[in-house]
Amino acid sequence: VRVKLNRFTGVCLLAFLCCSACQKGQEPSIAWYWWKTVYAPDSAELAYFNATGAKQLGVRLFDVDTSARYPFPSPKGILQQKQAWPDSVKLVPVVYITRAALLQPGSLDSLAVRIARLVGSLMKQSNWTEIQWDHDWTGSTRANYFALLRLLKQQAIFNNKTFAATIRLHQLRQTQPGLMPPVRKGLLMVYNMGHLTQAGNTNSILDEAVWKSYQSDLKKYPLPLDWAMPVFAWAVQFRQNRFVAILNGVRAKEVLASGLVDALPNGQYRCRKAGFLAGFGVQAGDVLRLEGADAATLEKIVRILRHERNDVQPTLYFFDWQNKHIPYFSSYDIQRISQAH
């Protein structure tokens, strides 16, 4: 009996060790980004938000940018809140900072004060514990950006607030001291990773070949990470192999319904005559490249993230919450993506 018991115990122990070895990271909670300048979701958008089981909402408050008229950094596209935030949802304000704003920022101290003042004004009626800073830093802006983050931390409005910063794929390899943002956690953007303006058969929103080239860096990145995935899509318009425009929100359905295009062998479309496609002007000979991601691709990415990362209670953001994406990602799709393992 004793031998049988030991064998049984050994089998159980082996099974436990095997399960532990292949244990996946925690299932992420669902969140959405609101990126429009007016917050006024309609009943269909609100119903969809609730149906996805979202627990968090990231809201872009404003951009920090320059202009020809006013060359110093100033707020652009300030959010207008027309209705109450969803009930029982964690609210996370987001501030987007352009590269131009940090190339010649003037006084960083003054900029930090002005940003803090505006955030405080926009969020004074809301409960929030975290703020995201969105900037795609490079060697030319990193020092100013990191200095600005440190100055922002000193502003009273941000006392006891969690600072998070967006992390692009190319920044996963910058793990040396001084090359990571001075924040508590990052938000890994799994989109906008390709060469948008270059002609060719690629997908600048989510290029799986580019994504795979960074998978070995996931485990090495020391900051805790939340994750962000794309549900948006667009068509990229080229004329004589030169970039013309982004046809925002245009998918295959609109392209085919236009009656203006012929399909090419590489999955792109050539316009055979001039006209308007989903409200966008096209010329004969223009080539349209459709970009985006489907639910199956996003599921694969979540599986990889859960396998490679040990983030505690990560949040999975979807970009972005609006009606035109709902037909392509059902609430079931969103839940299935977040539960992939």
Predicted ranges, named:
Residues 232, 240-341:
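Substrate-binding cleft of secreted/luminal carbohydrate-active enzymes
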Residues 43-66, 122-126:
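Catalytic domains of carbohydrate-active enzymes, especially glycoside hydrolases
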Residues 22-49, 60:
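Boundary/entry segment of secreted carbohydrate-active catalytic domains
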Residues 147-251:
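Substrate-binding surface in catalytic domains of secreted glycosidases
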Residues 64-65, 69-182, 188:
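Chitinase-like catalytic core of GlcNAc-active glycosidases
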Residues 1-29:
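Bacterial Sec-dependent N-terminal signal peptides
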Residues 30-34, 55-59, 91-95, 131, ...:
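Hydrophobic faces of well-ordered beta-strands that scaffold small-molecule active sites
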Residues 38-50, 108-123, 171-176, 294-306:
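Short, acidic/polar
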